[in-house]
């Protein structure tokens, strides 16, 4: 049996991108939730290249008297998951909680995640109840969740919810993975011995708009499909085999019909031939696109460029910048 260590210090990691309107309330509510734990805690806010006043607000929050906030400033926008990984590299707690800055997932849920982690779970995920998102966002999320479950075999209900808790050894394992395209919830489940999901509230977004546009959702889908599994390549091979067998069967059938009914009938089968041709061409383009995605990711990983660059770190215990 593995020994269950009680949680002594909690680190809350929050990526921030153009969230100046929600930051004061985010800091207040997150601090209050952490204070109620009766444990040591720190709140790491990672500015992901914001173009508004978010970075300055984070610095001020870190330098306030009695602050528990660590501000990490990235030199440009790298994306949500890269920003979270930057936060992971600076945590000091033995339980790490991730949270979005838009307050749609209430910080008041943090004590529930800590309590569940204290039961011995490596990863505590969450499922949003009564989602307050648009029809498009909810539909896209359902499709992505089903796609992930089928391609990875990991049966989790809501991969899109970033309100999650990870034991320190899970975070350390993820930090040893150097691929640039990373989807943290799936990566964490690969290393987790015990994982669980709990239902959480989901509120409407009070400030600003979602940072995930249609194209960013498409990019996220490609990341999910190609960065953690080779299942699409296997499916492509299976699909190619089915199409090839089907095309060969149709060709044989056309030859038999021509021999049976004469060349006059064959002229009327031109459209069928075109349909078969277009099917093959379409399948080739799909295959080339997927292979291109994998080759592109191999090229990116071979270059071994860092997934993020930390420009500045401000800790509350010292007014000096790292």
From Swiss-Prot:
Keyword list (alphabetical) reads: Antibiotic resistance, Cell inner membrane, Cell membrane, Glycosyltransferase, Lipid A biosynthesis, Lipid biosynthesis, Lipid metabolism, Lipopolysaccharide biosynthesis, Membrane, Transferase, Transmembrane, Transmembrane helix
Q: Which reaction does it catalyse?
A: UDP-4-deoxy-4-formamido-beta-L-arabinose + di-trans,octa-cis-undecaprenyl phosphate = 4-deoxy-4-formamido-alpha-L-arabinopyranosyl di-trans,octa-cis-undecaprenyl phosphate + UDP
Membrane topology summary: Multi-pass membrane protein
Q: Which organism is it from?
A: Escherichia coli O7:K1 (strain IAI39 / ExPEC)
Parts of the chain on the Cytoplasmic side: 1-235, 291-322
Q: Which GO BP terms apply? A: 4-amino-4-deoxy-alpha-L-arabinopyranosyl undecaprenyl phosphate biosynthetic process; lipid A biosynthetic process; lipopolysaccharide biosynthetic process; response to antibiotic
Q: Which NCBIfam families match?
A: PRK10714.1
Task: Tell me the name of the encoding gene.
Answer: arnC
- PANTHER family assigned to the protein according to its UniProt record, in alphabetical order: UNDECAPRENYL-PHOSPHATE 4-DEOXY-4-FORMAMIDO-L-ARABINOSE TRANSFERASE, UNDECAPRENYL-PHOSPHATE 4-DEOXY-4-FORMAMIDO-L-ARABINOSE TRANSFERASE-RELATED
Pathway(s) it belongs to: Glycolipid biosynthesis; 4-amino-4-deoxy-alpha-L-arabinose undecaprenyl phosphate biosynthesis; 4-amino-4-deoxy-alpha-L-arabinose undecaprenyl phosphate from UDP-4-deoxy-4-formamido-beta-L-arabinose and undecaprenyl phosphate: step 1/2; Bacterial outer membrane biogenesis; lipopolysaccharide biosynthesis
List locations, semicolon-separated: Cell inner membrane
Q: Kindly provide the name given to this protein in its UniProt entry.
A: Undecaprenyl-phosphate 4-deoxy-4-formamido-L-arabinose transferase
What's the stated role of this polypeptide? Catalyzes the transfer of 4-deoxy-4-formamido-L-arabinose from UDP to undecaprenyl phosphate. The modified arabinose is attached to lipid A and is required for resistance to polymyxin and cationic antimicrobial peptides.
